[in-house]
Amino acid sequence: MKDLSKYAGIIPAFYACYDEKGDISPKAVRELTQYYIDKGVKGLYVGGSSGECIYQTVPERKLLLENVMKVAKGKLTIIAHVACNGTRESMELAAHAESLGVDAIASIPPIYFHLPDAAIAKYWNDISSAAPNTDFIIYNIPQLAGVALNPSLLATMLENPRCIGVKNSSMPVEDIEKWIHCGAKVVFNGPDEQLLGGLVSGATGAIGGTYGAMPEVYLKIFELAKSGKDLDKARELQQDACQIIYKMCSGKGNMYAMIKEILRLRGAPDIGGVRAPLYPLQPGDEAIAASCAADIDAAIAQFCC
């Protein structure tokens, strides 16, 4: 029987860490990993959207994961997103991830061409076959991938004993209930703005792109939701988190550029900027980041101490 409790908790999506030349910084990767260990998160989701994976080469993605694992192995649950445009490269990353001892691999569906469900299932199962001793998680993010998971496709995938569930980043909370009803053993809430709703609907844990900027806030929401002792407080804290997210997105630069500045302001390691074509911080964005950092600290002081 698999131990699925390791997936129950707050799992920040790990950010790309670059040096002054824009190359992967192994040192910054290790430092950021330790930062999250010290914050008390359950795990890390490495190589996903928040990690700018689609703008990185296969060797770069390997290097980043290797340095996460140097620090995190045995301390955090590590889920490695391994999808590439092609099946061959995705399988290469899957095999590499398993060799490092990750807890699970994950994959979006094939992008650009709209493929039938049978082709999507084959893509996922081929990737899973390259990591035969590792859990597999479907990443459902239709607003970016261009294709949505459906009950029939999930049923097909659950015939693969390694497929344990879904990282669900579609917006309806209803989808979380749907995948649970379909037999998924593990379902992660994806949209950060609906963490509380996702947990109340039965999500096992949560993976989010803004969790890394304010892990204390999301850890408290998770604690309150799972205990059921003070849902009013959880709801108020979720509303604060949403307002901070909206402010993060109000700048001219990409949200992840904003988050990296917020991390610096909050004492986290300097992990560089974002990789083009993602838009870097623009004049005026630093003030927004400072305001977000102040709001995060205020929420922590009010709810998390």
Go through the PLM ranges and name each one.
Residues S129-T134, I141-C242, M248, K252:
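Catalytic alpha/beta core domains of metabolic enzymes, predominantly
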